[in-house]
Amino acid sequence: MMSTDGNVFDLSGMRGKSVLLYFQEGVTCQPCWDQAKDLATHSDQLRALGVDSVVTIASDPVDVMRRVAKDMSLSYPVLSDPDLAVSSAYHANDYGMMGRSRDGHSFVLVGPDGRIRWRADYGGAPDYTMYLPVPNLIADMRQGMRIPG
């Protein structure tokens, strides 16, 4: 996938690291971008949980997302998945207000071995949650991965 930094991102290049994939609706969803910023703000807590990197994925064109990522000073990869190929592979567009035309609000933690260690989908009915405080996300991750907290 194309990154807002102009490079092509390939998850296989992150082998040996835990990567939190954050699938979101994109530039028209301000709470989604607030979530992206909050993930960056809480990077130390995520690292303490074993998350080496965060990646944000949406279906908007990379040039549009580049402006938003720059405005928000996001330092981690922001990726464009315009045909929803990666999103569909992770079923991230199965949940959310827009049906399958856009991602919902899904998180997938890919472990160092490339396997999914944890996932959660917050964008679906009945609540359509577009922002989850990161401490709540961390608590959900701890519970889902059975890490004492």
Placement of each model-derived feature along the sequence:
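N-terminal "domain-start" segment that seeds a small globular fold
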Residues: 1-12
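Short active-site neighborhood of thiol/selenol oxidoreductases, capturing the structured segment around
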Residues: 11-39, 53
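Short hydrophobic alpha-helix segments
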Residues: 12, 90, 119-120
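Structural microenvironment flanking redox-active thiols in thiol-disulfide oxidoreductases
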Residues: 33-75
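Short, internal strand/loop/helix patches
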Residues: 66-104
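Thiol-/selenol-based redox modules, centered on thioredoxin-like
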Residues: 101-149
